């Protein structure tokens, strides 16, 4: 029988200690198991040793978990729908949803025919594990979210990466090249050009910190880059980043030129 492939997290090398409650919080257990896409964690009860538990427990209150447990992963719900599902008054619920969005447990957009605000409980990666790491002060207050992000990028795919063909087969993140890098190509698709996306979203554009760089630096690792302004949000995501203190609005082409210079340093 082959050895297990799991690469354990060496907590002794972290510049912080991951707190693991002696008495598990049941609502956090349920929420972690509901969101995770890690197969072993779906098939058994979570423990305080699981990153799905201690990652959420560090930043999510039981009241937040109550609301999130009324949702389904990646299924949008409007405020009236959530009001009905939770039984909470609209004003109280809206404030709580905003707090959940600020910490990064929820995202929101207006992507429906009525342009009505809708809330989404995302998966961990891509999703809340990244959002947890897009606020410098939040990382300082809850450094365990950095290790949680690392675990949620590694563990769900550890047994299948050897089977993924070149190109990724639709798994993971896909890169849009710097526009100048494809100017000399004979053929390229519109969606391969950053300018296509900027025009599509009519210049609504925000820049935020790189959650990858910022989290690894907090773990005592990383590449040494300045983490600010690497991540781009367009359209509704731009509003989400700004309104939840994860980014700032930016002038698209000015920012991209600065970004190209920064990347080439």
Per-region residue spans from a language model:
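Long, low-complexity, charged/polar intrinsically disordered regions in eukaryotic proteins
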Residues: 2-50
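Short helix-coil-helix linker/hinge
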Residues: 58-65
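Short acidic, hydrophobic short linear motifs in intrinsically disordered regions
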Residues: 74-85
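Short amphipathic alpha-helical interaction segments
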Residues: 88-99
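A short, conserved structural fragment
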Residues: 101-111
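Short, amphipathic alpha-helical interaction segments positioned at domain boundaries
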Residues: 117-152
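Long, Pro/Ser/Thr-rich low-complexity/intrinsically disordered regulatory tracts in eukaryotic proteins
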Residues: 152-241
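Conserved small/polar residues in nucleotide/adenosyl-binding loops
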Residues: 254-261
């Amino acid at each position: 029988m082959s050895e297990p492939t799991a690469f354990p997290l060496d907590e002794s090398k972290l510049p912080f200690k991951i707190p693991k409650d002696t008495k598990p919080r049941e609502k956090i257990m349920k929420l972690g198991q509901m969101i995770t896409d890690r197969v072993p964690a779906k098939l058994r009860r979570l423990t305080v040793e699981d990153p799905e538990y201690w990652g959420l427990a560090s930043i999510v209150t039981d009241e937040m978990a109550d609301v999130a447990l009324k949702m389904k992963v990646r299924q949008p719900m409007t405020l009236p729908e959530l009001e009905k599902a939770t039984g909470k008054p609209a004003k109280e619920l809206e404030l709580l949803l905003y707090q959940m969005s600020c910490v990064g447990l929820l995202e929101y957009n207006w992507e429906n025919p009525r342009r009505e605000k809708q809330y989404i409980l995302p998966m961990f990666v891509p999703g809340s594990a990244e959002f947890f790491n897009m606020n410098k002060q939040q990382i300082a207050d809850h450094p365990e979210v950095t290790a949680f992000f690392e675990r949620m990028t590694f563990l769900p795919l550890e047994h299948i990466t050897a089977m993924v063909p070149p190109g990724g087969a639709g798994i993971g993140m896909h890169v849009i090249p710097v526009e100048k890098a494809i100017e000399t190509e004979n053929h390229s698709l519109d969606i391969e050009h950053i300018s296509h996306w900027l025009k599509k979203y009519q210049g609504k554009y925000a820049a935020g910190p790189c959650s990858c760089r910022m989290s690894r630096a907090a773990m005592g690792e990383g590449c040494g880059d300045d983490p600010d302004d690497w991540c781009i949000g367009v359209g509704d995501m731009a509003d989400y980043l700004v309104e939840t203190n994860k980014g700032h609005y930016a002038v698209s082409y000015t920012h991209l030129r600065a970004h190209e210079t920064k990347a080439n340093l």
